[in-house]
């Protein structure tokens, strides 16, 4: 396989991941926030056994296995439930944007905990990403304090889970980089996520799961998307141009919002797109800070 082809396959993973906000929200409307997420990750985990493979548990570094599984499961649960508990389709897309603070936070964590060199660009990068999220939450008025507070109070749990999830994923990336030693535990982690969600589903009161044709289509699409995205990303990381893939991944907030708007039939305002571009720009500045550090 040529390097260009592998890079293209890796970039396809970014496109696939960008559909997850819309698909997870669509599935949760029929199967419930918890039941829908449990079904998605269970099916995805089974698919990953065939696309990525099941690792030999004993060979995986214990630190990575324990910390990685805890952080990965926690993050995926935060993400899925933040989207499922959102009050409206538009709010689900906003919640997804809050979660996209993770690229900037990942670089910050790499600087703080992994000794990543950096320069002054990291400060405006982090600030721009944070302002971008606030701009999105301000609705049509942009950076408007009262609108931001009013928006958050309509569904505080969703925004809280998305915000905490961004920090958890940044921590997961830091742990993986430091302790994985080339091992990939993604199949185990996704299966653990599904199992954890099923335990939560059966131990707590949950809405009835309503299986309709549209919901089943979205469920299968979400499971296959997640399964093939991780497989495609692995190909890109192993054989492609990692720099191009890294830059491409920082435009995920815009692509994800656009695809979610189509999947959920939720048109977005010009102010939203301004905020989304700020989040992307902030992430790119953080990345450039490490390249020139």
UniProtKB/Swiss-Prot annotation:
A UniProt-annotated Pfam family: EamA
Keyword Transport: yes
Localisation per UniProt entry: Cell inner membrane
InterPro entries assigned: Diverse_Substrate_Transporter, EamA_dom
Catalysed reaction equations from the record: L-phenylalanine(in) = L-phenylalanine(out); L-tyrosine(in) = L-tyrosine(out); L-tryptophan(in) = L-tryptophan(out); L-threonine(in) = L-threonine(out)
Ranges in the topological domain labelled Cytoplasmic: 1-6, 55-62, 114-118, 177-182, 240-243, 289-293
GO cellular component: plasma membrane
Protein topology in the membrane: Multi-pass membrane protein
GO BP of this protein: amino acid export across plasma membrane
Record flagged with keyword Cell membrane: yes
Positions of transmembrane segments: 7-27, 34-54, 63-83, 93-113, 119-139, 156-176, 183-203, 219-239, 244-264, 268-288
The EamA domain, residue ranges: 6-137, 158-285
Keyword list, A-Z: Amino-acid transport, Cell inner membrane, Cell membrane, Membrane, Repeat, Transmembrane, Transmembrane helix, Transport
Range of residues in the leader sequence: none
Periplasmic-side positions: 28-33, 84-92, 140-155, 204-218, 265-267
GO MF annotation list: amino acid transmembrane transporter activity; aromatic amino acid transmembrane transporter activity
Domain of life: Bacteria
Stated role: Amino acid transporter with broad substrate specificity. Can transport various amino acids, including phenylalanine, tyrosine, tryptophan, L-threonine, L-methionine, L-lysine, L-glutamate, L-valine and L-isoleucine. Overexpression confers resistance to phenylalanine and increases export of phenylalanine, tyrosine and tryptophan.
PANTHER family according to UniProt: AROMATIC AMINO ACID EXPORTER YDDG, OS03G0707200 PROTEIN-RELATED
Annotated family: Belongs to the drug/metabolite transporter (DMT) superfamily. Aromatic amino acid/paraquat exporter (ArAA/P-E) (TC 2.A.7.17) family.
Protein name in the entry: Aromatic amino acid exporter YddG
UniProt organism field: Escherichia coli (strain K12)
Name of the gene encoding the protein in the UniProt record: yddG
């Amino acid at each position: 396989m040529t390097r260009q082809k592998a890079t293209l396959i890796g970039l396809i993973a970014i496109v696939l991941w960008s559909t997850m906000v819309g698909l997870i929200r669509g599935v949760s409307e029929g199967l419930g926030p918890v039941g829908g997420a449990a079904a998605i990750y269970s099916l995805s985990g089974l698919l990953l056994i065939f696309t990525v493979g099941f690792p030999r548990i004993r060979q995986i570094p214990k630190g990575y296995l324990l910390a990685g599984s805890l952080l990965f499961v926690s993050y995926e649960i935060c993400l899925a439930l933040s989207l499922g508990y959102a009050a409206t389709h538009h709010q689900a897309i906003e919640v997804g944007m809050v979660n996209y603070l993770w690229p900037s936070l990942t670089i910050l964590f790499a600087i703080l905990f992994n000794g990543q060199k950096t320069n002054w660009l990291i400060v405006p990068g982090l600030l721009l990403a944070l302002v971008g999220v606030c701009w999105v939450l301000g609705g049509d008025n942009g950076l408007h304090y009262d609108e931001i507070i009013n928006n958050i109070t309509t569904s505080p749990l969703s925004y809280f889970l998305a915000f905490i999830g961004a920090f958890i994923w940044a921590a997961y990336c830091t742990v993986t980089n430091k302790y994985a030693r080339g091992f990939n535990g993604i199949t185990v982690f996704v299966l653990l996520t599904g199992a954890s969600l099923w335990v939560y589903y059966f131990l707590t009161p949950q809405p009835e799961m309503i299986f309709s044709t549209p919901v089943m289509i979205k469920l299968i699409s979400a499971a296959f998307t997640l399964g093939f995205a991780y497989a495609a990303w692995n190909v890109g990381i192993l054989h492609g141009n990692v720099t191009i893939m890294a830059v491409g991944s920082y435009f995920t907030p815009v692509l994800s919002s656009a695809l979610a708007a189509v999947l959920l039939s939720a048109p977005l305002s010009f102010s939203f797109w301004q905020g989304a571009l700020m989040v992307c720009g902030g992430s790119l500045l953080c990345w450039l800070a490490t390249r020139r550090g």
